[in-house]
Amino acid sequence: MLEDLLGVGEIYVDYEGGNPTGTHKDRIARAHVEKALEEGFSGITVGTCGNYGASIAYHAAIHGLRAVVFVPAGYTNARLPEMRSLGAEVVEVPGSYEDAVEASRHFALLTGFYDANPGSNREVDFKAYSDMAVGIASRVRPTAVFVPLGNGTTLSGLWKGFRGLGITPTMVGVTTAFGNEILRRFYGESEGDFAETVFNEPLVSERSFDAEEALEAIKESRGYVFGFPDDVALRYTELLRSTAGINPLPASALVLAGLVKFVRKFGITDGRFVLVVTGGVHVG
C-alpha cells in the first residue's frame, strides 16, 4: 500500500516497537546488563532522555542488578515513573542530555558501577545493532536503509553489520531539524537551532556521541541526512499507522519522511527500501 501511495519499488518496515520497553534500546540495554553481570559489576548507570533509561531499568530489574539513571531535569522525561516502578534510582541533573551523560559517567568512576553510556562501551552497542542488520538481510537485500539519528549509534552499528555481510546499501539518517550534531556537520554548519520537544526528544543531540562513526558510514555508503520539524513527524506517524498497521513514535516515523524526500531529491524509485522504525508507543 505504501509502495502504491509513494510510487516506489518495495518498502520493508523493520519495526522495533515490539521489544519489551517498546524501542530498539532494549537490544543494547540487554547486552550491557549481560556484560555487567559477566564482569561482576553490582550496578549499572546511564544518562538518558527516557527510552534508554527505561530499557536499562527493565533489564537490570530482571537480573537483580541495581540501576541508577541520570536524566536532564529540563526535558519532558515522560518515562521517569516507569523507570522508578522498575526499581531504578533516578537522578535529575540540571542542564542538557549531555550533562546527564557526563554525570552518569562520573558516578560510574566514583562507585565502580558499569558505565552503559553512549561512547563508553561502544563496541557492545555496535554489535547489538549489527545484529539488526543480519535480521534485515535475512528478509531482503536493501538498496537503501533509513534510520533515525540521535547519537548515530544505530546507523553505525547497522552499517557495520551490513558491511560484514558484504552488503552495502545507501545509509540515510533522518533526524530532527532542531538540534542534532550529525545533521549540522553533514551540511557543514558550525551552529544550529536547538529545541527539545516531547516528539523529537529521542533525536535531539547537541553532541552526538557516535557522530564520527555515523558520518563515516554515511560517506562510505554514499548516503545522506535529512532533518524535519515535529509537524512532519506527526504527519508521517499517522500515515504509518494507517498504512503499515503499527503505532510508531513520531521520532521513528520520520524515516518515512526521509524516504519521500530521498525519492524526490534523487529520483530513485526502483529498489528495496528499508524503514528502521526504532520505537513504538509504549504503555508501561
Residue ranges and their predicted role:
Residues M1-G284:
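PLP-dependent amino-acid enzyme catalytic core
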